[in-house]
């Protein structure tokens, strides 16, 4: 006789493997796609795969937020920005200041490495143990606006910078 527990675990492992495979496939397609619109659509499909993985890992709130925020807002924003720009793919060469770009990149890596190794990574014990518990949303909200207020504010600055960049790109060459 087949044990239902083993069948459920095997099915869960198979679904996880399928979602991981689909997510990695679309992530690779984002990088290698020649058409920017297809790359944007592949990015949205990759985000759907990540949302499925969140739901499979019993973090339904994060899965729904992934769909609403990243797919519904960011993904569509990226597609609109790509479709509204009138630049041709593979156009003329872009003037790049390579030494300055290398210096900025090196500075960014130094900040990330310093932050990663210089932080004492304590586990947060304030979250409930059951992630499917509805009170988890309240715990996440409290943590965002208490312990993680600085990353939350940095995220708002990054979104503002991307909005300014999108407006700059959508203006067109003649209006700058």
Curated annotation (Swiss-Prot):
Belongs to the complex I subunit 6 family. It catalyses: methanophenazine + reduced coenzyme F420-(gamma-L-Glu)(n) = dihydromethanophenazine + oxidized coenzyme F420-(gamma-L-Glu)(n) + H(+). One of its GO terms (biological process) is methanol metabolic process. The chain crosses the membrane at residues 13-33, 39-59, 64-84, 99-119, 140-160. Component of the F(420)H(2) dehydrogenase (FPO complex) which is part of the energy-conserving F(420)H(2):heterodisulfide oxidoreductase system. The membrane-bound electron transfer system of the complex plays an important role in the metabolism of methylotrophic methanogens when the organisms grow on methanol or methylamines. Catalyzes the oxidation of methanophenazine to dihydromethanophenazine. It shuttles electrons from F(420)H(2), via FAD and iron-sulfur (Fe-S) centers, to methanophenazine (an electron carrier in the membrane). It is found in: Cell membrane. The keyword Transport applies. The keyword Transferase does not apply. GO terms for cellular component: plasma membrane. Keywords: Cell membrane, Electron transport, Membrane, Methanogenesis, Methanol utilization, Oxidoreductase, Transmembrane, Transmembrane helix, Transport. Its main location: membrane. One of its GO terms (molecular function) is reduced coenzyme F420 dehydrogenase activity. It comes from Methanosarcina mazei (strain ATCC BAA-159 / DSM 3647 / Goe1 / Go1 / JCM 11833 / OCM 88) (Methanosarcina frisia). Signal peptide: none annotated. Optimum temperature is 39 degrees Celsius. It is a multi-pass membrane protein. Optimum pH is 8.5. This is F(420)H(2) dehydrogenase subunit J. Pfam families: Oxidored_q3 (PF00499). Its EC number is 1.5.98.3. The FPO complex is composed of at least 13 different subunits. FpoA, FpoH, FpoJ, FpoK, FpoL, FpoM and FpoN proteins constitute the membrane sector of the complex.
């Amino acid at each position: 006789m087949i044990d239902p527990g083993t069948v459920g675990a095997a099915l869960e492992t198979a679904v996880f493997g399928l979602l991981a495979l689909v997510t990695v496939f679309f992530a690779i397609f984002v990088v290698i796609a020649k058409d920017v619109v297809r790359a944007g659509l592949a990015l949205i499909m990759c985000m759907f795969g990540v949302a499925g993985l969140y739901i499979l890992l019993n973090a339904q709130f994060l899965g729904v937020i992934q769909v609403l925020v990243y797919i519904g807002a960011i993904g569509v924003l990226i597609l609109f920005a790509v479709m509204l720009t009138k630049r041709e793919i593979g156009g003329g060469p872009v003037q790049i200041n390579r030494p300055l770009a290398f210096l900025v990149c090196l500075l960014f890596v130094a900040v990330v490495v310093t932050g990663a190794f210089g932080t004492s990574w304590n586990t947060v014990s304030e979250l409930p143990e059951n992630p499917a518990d509805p009170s988890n949303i309240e715990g996440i909200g409290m943590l965002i606006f208490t312990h993680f207020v600085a990353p939350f504010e940095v995220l708002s600055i990054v979104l503002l910078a991307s909005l300014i960049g999108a407006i700059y790109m959508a203006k067109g060459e003649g209006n700058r």
